[in-house]
Amino acid sequence: MDSAAPSPLQRIDQDLFDAVAAAAAGSPRRRRNHNFHAPSDRVQRFLNVLQPGTYVRPHRHRRAQPGDGFECFLVLQGAVGLLLLDAKGRVLQRERISAAGPLRGIELAEGVIHTLVALSPDAVMMEIKQGPYEPAADKDFLPGFPLEGSEAAAAQEAAWRALFGPGDDHLSPAHPLP
């Protein structure tokens, strides 16, 4: 599921959502990507399916190549919480992004430290960002946060998920982003 399909037309339908969600549920990481791009493509396009309990270590993207290193998230099924953090790991802003709205997607500028939490089972996001994909340089992780798979990571994910109460569709920042 992680490689691009050779077909000139790639369907984005419920069958695909269900297949990738099942793979995510069976994964120790509790998430799975389905790429529509080749690693060398100038634009990365993929589904990112998250299950509750997945831990996304806080990170930012910095590009070595010229261009705008944006990241665009559009939730197609379920709900996801986005947290923007400062350099010390403090939450600056929380956003509930949901296929049921009112906020269904965001575009995030390069260099912004962030993490995601699954707020529903089988949460499906379409992500678009500038390529090519360079695994060694894709993410700059924020120091001081636990590694994936640890008990501390599970506790951190639960604490972040608790920041999103039921029905909190948009929570304003405590203070503006730098």
Question: What do these predicted regions represent?
Answer:
Residues 1-47, 95-98, 159-178:
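A short, N-terminal "cap"/entry segment at the start of jelly-roll beta-barrel domains
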Residues 29-30, 48-67, 99:
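Conserved short histidine dyad/triad with adjacent acidic residue
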Residues 40-41, 65-67, 99, 108-110:
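Short solvent-exposed loop/turn micro-motifs enriched in small/polar/acidic residues
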Residues 46-48, 65-66, 70-75, 106, ...:
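His/acidic/aromatic-lined binding-pocket segments of jelly-roll/cupin-type domains
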Residues 51, 69-87:
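Glycine- and acidic-residue-biased ligand/ion/polar-headgroup-sensing regions
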Residues 58, 82-84, 106-108, 114-119, ...:
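Short beta-strand His + acidic residue motifs that chelate non-heme Fe in jelly-roll/DSBH
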Residues 86-114:
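Short acidic-glycine-tyrosine-enriched beta hairpin
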Residues 90, 115-178:
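Double-stranded beta-helix
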